Amino acid sequence: MNKEEKTIAIYSAATDLKPLTVSFNNTILGINPWSQEVNVLHMYGGFNGFAYDAGTDEETGKPLMYCQVKYDLIQSLANPKVFVYKGDVLPRTKSTDKYGKTNAGWVNFCTLRYANNGWFVGSTADAERDKRNGYKEVEAGKIEGAVVGQSHNRYAYFLIPEGCNYVVVDIENNTVLFDIK
């Protein structure tokens, strides 16, 4: 559905949109490359003080260490490459990174809940592994560019705007929207 053009696309089973399959190095499992169909995105970062759910990953049996299910972005029924969070206002906990930089509400999005070396959707902020994290201020209601993969983008975060309770991540067009609904 395209609200701007006021159009709706209907797909048949033959032309159904398919989820994105990504490949990356999974050093926790020692499987390189690891392939995974993206069917959920997890919020990762200091936004919630790095809180995580207890338990183990169903697929691997590895302990969960990085994310809380209540902040997961759910795959859209209309397009399997679009993920949506609609819920409580997101926390904006102030956290200091390992380089001494303090920000409130920093977040990016990942495919794994047991490792920080998965496939990520990060901001366009300048970041470099083992040198610096990057942080991008965003406005509610404004679509932002994103960088996907398993490179320096894992260290590039969005700063959640005040009052945000709605997030859309589009991994087909590499965009992120934070909003208040």
Task: Show which residues each predicted segment covers.
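Short amphipathic, basic-aromatic surface patches that mediate peripheral association
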Residues: 24-32
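Primarily marks secretory-pathway-exposed extracellular/lumenal segments that are disulfide-
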Residues: 27, 180-181
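Short, conserved beta-strand segments of beta-strand-rich sandwich/propeller modules, principally
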Residues: 106-108
